[in-house]
């Protein structure tokens, strides 16, 4: 009896499973999968490092300062504020779902999250530290020495372990179960009529040529300003990495997941509202001027891409010891 029921249950699951996959497969956007295969001990350690401002020269700036997980993984300002209140050159993209990206940074200069994570600690305009000093700080904190030993099995902390742990934590920062994903997975009443019409416009106008896949972006580099040039603060974009002039003004297509939370928009953070961003995209990328109503529907659709935000207890960081090098918040 029990086995028979189990078999029926399995058959039903298998059937539903295929139906779900087929429904999602015919759309250019796929639902986000919850994080799988993460090392939980490493995630906990990486979470602490992500929130630890002692990895910065000032002792004041952590990853979370610019990628605030209470605010969609961004800082919600046009360009970031770094060490000594320096104004950064470019808008901070969200860390949410960044594990789905083809590469990291607007110009894709880091291949993956691990490579990316070493950058900001040593960037003079961001955390302004050195990897050696960051390791000295961690090695002086007994709580960290214990935890690194548990996770990596050695008494000696190095930058490779630090970036590995941060990247592992970042893998958990995905946002499944948005209303749009529920719709993709078969819940037909998850979207309103306006939102569905917005999605249809998004597809039929050609937005999906660049914003597609699980991340609704993040998987290719494209020119900003195909039909009309972008008038904002332009940098070289992808050409800075490839040295190829054809890649000028090419940027990694940003993910549109949680886009309602990640304002202001574009690499220079010049536009604050989705209404403006959709208008700019329509005109510059597709040569299309949307009516007010069309624009509002696309915006309504974009807002259905907000998923479940990562939930966890705020990590409590191990205290410094008498030997911990002191922060230098005001220069020196
Ligand atoms: C002072 C602000 C600041 C701090 C601190 C900071 N970042 Fe960033 N982060 C940025 C900016 C700005 C960019 C975009 C830079 C670029 O593309 O050239 C970025 C890019 C990224 C990206 C790439 C996302 C994408 O879609 O390309 C990831 C991932 C990331 N940061 C993670 C981290 C981690 C992990 C830390 C801590 C070790 C950190 N950041 C610290 C501002 C900051
Ligand atoms: C040819 C490729 C392409 C097409 C087509 C395209 N986009 Fe984009 N989209 C991009 C790129 C590249 C960026 C980043 C540009 C930058 O920051 O300079 C972007 C940025 C955005 C942003 C800002 C996201 C952020 O976090 O800054 C929104 C919103 C957006 N697109 C929506 C749309 C909509 C809606 C359409 C259809 C009307 C569309 N896009 C069509 C490539 C494209």
What label would you give each PLM region?
Residues 9-19:
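Bacterial N-terminal signal peptides
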Residues 4-7, 21-332:
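Periplasmic c-type cytochrome electron-transfer domains
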């Amino acid at each position: 009896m029990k086995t028979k029921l189990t078999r029926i249950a399995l058959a039903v699951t298998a059937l539903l499973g295929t139906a779900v996959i087929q429904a999602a497969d015919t759309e250019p956007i796929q639902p986000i999968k919850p994080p799988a295969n993460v090392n939980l001990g490493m995630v906990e350690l990486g979470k602490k490092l992500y929130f630890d401002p002692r990895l910065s020269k000032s002792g004041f700036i952590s990853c979370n300062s610019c990628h605030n997980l209470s605010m969609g993984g961004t800082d919600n300002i046009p360009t970031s504020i770094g060490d000594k209140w320096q104004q950064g050159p470019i808008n901070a993209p969200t860390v949410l779902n960044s594990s789905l990206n083809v590469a990291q940074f607007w110009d894709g200069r880091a291949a993956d999250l691990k490579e990316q994570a070493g950058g900001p600690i040593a960037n003079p305009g961001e955390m302004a530290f050195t990897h050696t000093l960051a390791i000295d700080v961690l090695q002086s904190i007994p709580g960290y020495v214990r935890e690194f030993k548990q996770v990596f099995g050695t008494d000696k902390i190095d930058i490779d372990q630090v970036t590995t742990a941060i990247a592992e934590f970042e893998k958990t920062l995905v946002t499944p179960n948005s209303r749009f994903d529920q719709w993709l997975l078969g819940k037909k009443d998850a979207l309103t009529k306006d939102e569905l019409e917005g999605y249809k416009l998004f597809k039929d106008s050609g937005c999906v040529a660049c914003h597609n896949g699980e991340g609704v972006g993040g998987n290719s580099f494209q020119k900003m300003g195909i039909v009309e040039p972008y008038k904002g603060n332009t940098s070289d974009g992808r050409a800075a990495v490839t040295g190829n002039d054809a890649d000028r003004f090419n940027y990694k297509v940003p993910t549109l997941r949680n886009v309602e939370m990640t304002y202001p928009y574009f690499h220079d953070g010049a536009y604050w509202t989705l209404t403006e961003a959709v208008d700019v995209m329509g005109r510059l990328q597709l040569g299309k001027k949307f009516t007010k109503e069309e624009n509002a529907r696309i915006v309504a659709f974009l807002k259905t891409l907000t998923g479940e935000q990562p939930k966890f207890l705020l990590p409590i960081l191990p205290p410094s010891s008498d030997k911990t090098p002191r922060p230098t918040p005001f220069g020196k």
